[in-house]
From Swiss-Prot:
PANTHER family: PARANEOPLASTIC ANTIGEN, PARANEOPLASTIC ANTIGEN MA2
GO cellular component, one term: nucleolus
Record InterPro entries: PNMA, PNMA_C, PNMA_N
Encoding gene, per UniProt annotation: PNMA2
Biased composition (Basic and acidic residues): 352-364
Protein name: Paraneoplastic antigen Ma2
Ranges of compositional bias, category Acidic residues: 335-351
Record region (Disordered): 335-364
Species per Swiss-Prot/TrEMBL record: Homo sapiens
Additional remarks: Antibodies against PNMA2 are present in sera from patients suffering of paraneoplastic neurological disorders.
Keyword Acetylation attached: yes
Family of the protein in this entry: Belongs to the PNMA family.
Length: 364
């Protein structure tokens, strides 16, 4: 991180990074004269230098300065740290062989992957580096070209997102950090859709959240069918760990659910939605008519005032039934309007009493 900052800073200041130093850990309240006093004493063996700039590093809560060496210096003479006021100041510098070492590791990695440096540049959208020119380019220049290529490489259309799943084991006595199957399944069903990776990688990430019997099941279904999809894996989990409730039971439970005394219509609809989704998952209710079934059940199972009944009846007659959120919006608006009307009704008698007393005093 510090070395990368040194390289970027040198690039901005247009100075040779091989002839520059960065000193970090300088107390933020130090003036330039105080910094110079310490550096002149501790770096005098390096010869003449020039202080090019100072920045504040938030992560260290301290300053850093960039120095340009004005004389040829033996790298071995550069200290890695100096004793400054307020503590030790670190000295960051780039050794001449760091680019070479990096490129050696890069070549070794590419060789293992069956790739070449020129092929890597082509993949980054840089066509100017051919196989014939690579051996003729110095390590320093090649590292510089690679840095430029990486900076200008096209970014992926989708950011790499990896929302980690919670843990599920399927054990009879789950550990405290584990989720119930229903909660885990709901989260897994949503999150796997966001993972912009291959099916194989999705299955690997899915397996990372599993323990015990659940992980055993994952291994079994993959052994039986190596090309099984993530959705099919989740379906297998439903069959093994899901509720044993039948289609008919799920359907009847939904249709026999009514608004309870004192329960708001919006709260009833929210409670009903959980049962509807379960019935749809069991294929007890076709997904394509879920909105219609929801609206009909609310009209049949809830105690509605005349205004809300008329609005829902209008929605049913006019066209496609509303979605869950659209229906909730209509119901919440009506509940707020009804609550506002009730508050006004409570305040009106008090206002009439006040006017009566005022008129009575006026008569006196």
């Amino acid at each position: 991180m510090a070395l990368a900052l040194l390289e970027d800073w040198c690039r901005i200041m247009s100075v040779d990074e091989q002839k520059s130093l960065m000193v970090t850990g300088i107390p933020a309240d130090f003036e330039e004269a105080e910094i110079q006093e310490v550096l002149q004493e501790t770096l005098k063996s390096l010869g003449r230098y020039r202080l090019l700039g100072k920045i504040f590093r938030k992560q260290e809560n301290a300053n850093a300065v960039l120095l340009e060496l004005l004389e040829d210096t033996d790298v071995s003479a550069i200290p890695s740290e100096v004793q400054g006021k307020g503590g030790v100041w670190k000295v960051i510098f780039k050794t001449p062989n760091q680019d070479t070492e990096f490129l050696e590791r890069l070549n070794l990695f590419l060789e293992k992957e069956g790739q070449t440096v020129s092929g890597m540049f082509r993949a980054l959208g840089q066509e100017g580096v051919s196989p014939a020119t690579v051996p003729c380019i110095s390590p320093e220049l090649l590292a510089h070209l690679l840095g430029q290529a990486m900076a200008h490489a096209p970014q992926p259309l989708l950011p790499m997102r990896y929302r980690k799943l919670r843990v599920f084991s399927g054990s009879a006595v789950p550990a405290p950090e584990e989720e119930s199957f229903e909660v885990w399944l709901e989260q897994a069903t949503e999150i796997v859709k966001e993972w912009p990776v291959t099916e194989a990688e999705k299955k690997r990430w899915l397996a990372e959240s599993l323990r015990g019997p659940a992980l055993d099941l994952m291994h079994i279904v993959q052994a039986d069918n190596p090309s099984i999809s993530v959705e099919e894996c989740l379906e297998a989990f439903k069959q093994v760990f899901g509720s044993l409730e039948s289609r008919r039971t799920a359907q009847v439970r939904y249709l026999k659910t009514y608004q309870e005394e004192g329960e708001k219509v919006s709260a009833y609809v929210l409670r009903l939605e959980t049962l509807l989704r379960r019935a749809v998952e069991k294929r007890a209710i076709p997904r394509r008519i879920a909105d219609q079934v929801r609206l009909e059940q609310v009209m049949a199972g809830a105690t509605l005032n005349q205004m809300l009944w008329c609005r829902l009846r209008e929605l049913k007659d006019q066209g496609p039934p509303p979605s869950f959120l659209e229906l909730m919006k209509v119901i919440r608006e009506e509940e707020e309007e009804e609550a506002s009307f009730e508050n006004e009704s409570i305040e009106e008698p008090e206002e009439r009493d006040g006017y009566g007393r005022w008129n009575h005093e006026g008569d006196d």
